[in-house]
Structures are given as structure tokens and as C-alpha cells.
């Protein structure tokens, strides 16, 4: 899109080259942009340390950095911090082929057991928003009323377990689930995997596992290097996983439900859901 007069998402500035932005004469707004410069110079870097060094040595005035990213660079000079919204979503995914987590009622119960506000505030340092629905709470189509019906509630969690006939049947401290295909009950146990490249995601996944185990689950968290993590997702070698995705700006979820989707793991492909995404 560099060669286009108005590349998508260029806003008040347009790319003239890899290292230079200039005022966009075709900008759709009549108001003056937030910054009043005729041009903005860009600095190309390859490493996180180069981002840090260029900023600390005042070679650049502004950097975009994600405190929750594995590539986050910490800065030691004085600076002003602005919060920029993004469509990055962290979430818990399930293996629909798991003998335990194939149970819809059990998965629904977990929705009420995760304190998203705590994770966003205390683990992500406030650089995240708690969202029950798979979109930003600031999005115009985010249904707050609907989201509130699925928010953190241990009372609703227990009610959902009862509806799914999940209980500690042998009184050993671990919840049990009757599996009709097996003809007997099995413990609500399994393995959650998370990529070890991000300390923040490992910490968040640990919080989820600990919270569920305190409620009667028997989950094990397994951290994996990126290549091993991807392999486990692609082969379905997991019960749950803690993931992250940068969604499109309209929060399109089709990559999860298309059989060829980039995020379709654990038998999640669903033509009905895919059609809903495409409407």
C-alpha cells in the first residue's frame, strides 16, 4: 500500500518511504491532527534493545511498545506514557475433542470462574481491558448488557456446574464429570499449555489454572517454547491453551471457526459459527 495515494489506515500521515511520513492531503477529517508536523521521521530497528537505545539516547521521540509482549523493552529514562488501544486478545481455548472439555456445560461454567478484571489490572499492569465477549469493550457493537450476564460470578459458576451434572462424586476434592461415551465418571482434569516466550502470558495462565484448581479442577500448566507450543496446538496435544491473537479492527473471529483458519485448533471448526462471522 506504500505506492497508493491513500493507503488503508494512514490517517493524517502517509508513508513517503520506509523512513518518512508526510501529511496526508486526502485525510478524511477536517480537524487538525493531534501532532502538528509536516513530516515524521522513522527509524528502522531489528532488535528490542535497539528500540530501547534509540529512545533512551533521544534519537527518537516516540516508540510503540507493548508491556505485555515478549519483545517489550524496559526504559530507564524519564518518559511520558500514553495508552494506545489495540485489537490484541488473550483468551483460553479448548480442545473440543478432549473427553472432559468437550462438555459444553463445563466450558460454560469456566466463563464465570475467571476474574478478568484481576488479570487485566494486577497481572497486565492495567495495560489491558477485561472483556467477556471477544471484542474490545470500547467497540460500538460490544453488548455490555450481554457481557454482564457472563461476567465473573462464583454463584453462577456453581449453578452451571449443577446444570452440567459436575460434582465431586467420590469426595476426593476433585470434581467429576460423567462421560456418556465411556459409561462412567472421570475427574475434571487436564493440561493447559502456554508459550513460554511471554512471562506475562505464563503468569496469566498460572492465575487461571490456580483459580480453577481452587474450585475443584485438577489442571496442570505446561510451558512450551514457541515451536513446541505451535506443534501441540496443531496436533491437538492439549486440553486447554492460553493464547493471544491480534484480531482485525472489526474483531473478525472467522480464523477460529474455518477449517483452514489460522487459529482453528482442537476441532473448533464450525460452519454455523463461520457463517455468523461472515454476516
Question: Predicted regions: what is each one?
Answer:
Residues 49-60, 75-76, 104-105, 206-215, ...:
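Short helices/loops that flank or line small-molecule/ion binding pockets
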Residues 1-35, 39, 49, 154-159:
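Gly/Pro-rich hinge or "lid" segments in bacterial periplasmic/extracellular proteins
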Residues 20-23, 102-210:
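Append "and occasionally in soluble cytosolic enzymes with long acidic Gly/Pro-rich linkers
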Residues 11-14, 19-20, 37-44, 186-196, ...:
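Short, well-ordered beta-strand elements
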Residues 26-73, 218-220:
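Ligand-site clamp/hinge motif
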Residues 80-95, 265-275:
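Periplasmic-binding protein-like
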Residues 108, 120-121, 214, 220-229, ...:
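Extracytoplasmic/peripheral linker and loop segments enriched in polar/acidic and small residues
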Residues 71-83, 236-237, 250-264:
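Ligand-binding "clamshell"
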Amino acid at each position: 500500500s506504500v505506492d497508493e495515494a491513500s493507503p488503508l489506515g494512514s490517517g493524517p500521515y502517509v508513508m513517503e518511504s520506509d523512513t518518512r511520513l508526510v501529511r496526508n492531503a486526502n485525510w478524511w477529517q477536517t480537524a487538525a491532527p493531534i501532532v502538528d508536523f509536516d513530516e515524521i521521521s522513522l527509524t528502522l530497528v531489528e532488535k528490542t534493545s535497539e528500540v530501547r537505545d534509540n529512545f533512551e539516547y533521544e534519537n527518537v521521540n516516540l516508540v510503540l511498545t507493548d508491556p505485555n509482549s515478549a519483545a517489550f523493552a524496559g526504559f530507564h529514562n524519564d518518559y511520558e506514557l500514553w495508552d494506545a488501544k489495540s485489537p490484541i486478545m488473550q483468551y483460553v481455548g479448548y480442545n473440543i475433542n478432549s473427553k472432559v472439555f468437550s462438555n459444553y456445560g463445563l466450558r460454560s461454567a469456566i466463563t464465570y470462574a475467571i476474574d478478568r478484571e484481576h488479570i487485566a489490572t494486577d497481572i497486565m499492569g492495567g495495560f489491558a481491558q477485561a472483556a467477556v465477549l471477544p471484542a474490545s469493550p470500547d467497540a460500538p457493537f460490544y453488548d455490555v448488557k450481554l457481557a454482564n450476564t457472563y461476567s465473573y460470578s462464583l454463584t453462577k459458576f456453581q449453578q452451571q456446574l449443577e446444570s452440567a451434572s459436575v460434582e465431586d462424586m467420590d469426595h476426593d476434592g476433585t470434581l467429576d464429570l460423567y462421560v456418556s461415551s465411556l459409561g462412567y465418571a472421570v475427574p475434571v482434569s487436564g493440561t493447559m499449555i502456554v508459550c513460554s516466550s511471554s512471562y506475562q502470558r505464563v503468569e496469566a495462565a498460572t492465575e487461571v489454572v490456580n483459580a480453577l484448581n481452587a474450585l475443584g479442577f485438577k489442571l496442570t500448566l505446561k510451558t512450551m517454547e514457541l515451536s513446541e507450543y505451535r506443534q501441540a496446538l496443531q496436533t491437538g496435544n492439549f486440553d486447554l491453551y492460553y493464547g493471544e491473537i491480534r484480531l482485525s479492527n472489526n474483531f473478525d473471529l472467522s480464523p477460529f471457526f474455518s477449517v483452514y483458519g489460522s487459529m482453528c485448533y482442537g476441532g473448533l471448526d464450525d460452519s454455523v459459527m463461520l457463517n455468523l462471522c461472515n454476516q
